[in-house]
Amino acid sequence: MAITAAMVKELRESTGAGMMDAKKALVENDGDMEAAVDWLRTKGLAKAAKKSGRTAAEGLVAVVVDGGKGVAVEVNSETDFVAKNGEFQTMVAGIAKAALSVNTVEELAEADLGGKTVATTLTDKIATIGENMTLRRMAKLEGETVVSYVHNAATDGMGKIGVLVALSGGDEAIGKQVAMHIAAVNPAALSEADLDPAIVEKERQVQIDIARESGKPEQVIEKMIEGRMKKFVAESTLLNQQFVVNPDLTVEAAAKEAGATVTGFIRVEVGEGIEVEKEDFAAEVAKAAQG
């Protein structure tokens, strides 16, 4: 696979690696960005552990809470201009309310919205506004108390990041603080038991490779891996993370002080995981010249 300057730039920005190191990592891994990040980490050349994911899709996430039940819905548009459109926002708000009564995004597409299905409403709005729109996903959360938070809100209850937190005990104040923490830190799971085993094993293999590169004795390597995996779990799981409001406490400890237990959460970000192809300027000009 041909390694482009844009690929090298993206890898450098996501890891802090030097230009030649980034290029070598991509060559060694046939252009696979995630594998290149892991390769750099193994060699001790990546200053940042997080992998960058391009999230160029636009739209809105809307959150609605009704008693002990909450829902987050993502509706995508082609441009941010449409996401700021009042008609689009009203439609998204209606879709989110309809989502409270269904369990899957497929059911939501067929749900009633003002006498039409959600799918038909979307089709009509595409014709009216003149831009493609998609109902991408929905997620539901239930608990004794469910609290919502929207980061970078476009209007009430919708924005670029929507968070729902389920609590047992406590009050809305601690729930709102935890929700803001989730929006900012983006934990992978609630607790160690909830972490995807595949993600844990992949990280373990990376740490094994890093430790063995040190050339230290096996017993020392084992302790290094154990310590680094504990750190990985603490940084990846909500309950074990340092609370952004008070870093002296974990989220679990802060909630406990407020008389609450966090039982679940959902975080939905617009465009998360979607990659949009980008042409460089020369390619755009060439395509335009061809008519």
From Swiss-Prot:
GO cellular component: cytoplasm
Family named by the database record: Belongs to the EF-Ts family.
Protein name per the record: Elongation factor Ts
Keywords from the UniProt entry: Cytoplasm, Elongation factor, Protein biosynthesis
NCBIfam families recorded: tsf
Pfam family, any one: EF_TS
PANTHER family: ELONGATION FACTOR TS, ELONGATION FACTOR TS, MITOCHONDRIAL
Function, as annotated: Associates with the EF-Tu.GDP complex and induces the exchange of GDP to GTP. It remains bound to the aminoacyl-tRNA.EF-Tu.GTP complex up to the GTP hydrolysis stage on the ribosome.
UniProt superkingdom: Bacteria
Subcellular location: Cytoplasm
Region (Involved in Mg(2+) ion dislocation from EF-Tu): 79-82
A GO term, aspect molecular function: translation elongation factor activity
Main location, first listed in the record: cytoplasm
The gene coding this protein: tsf
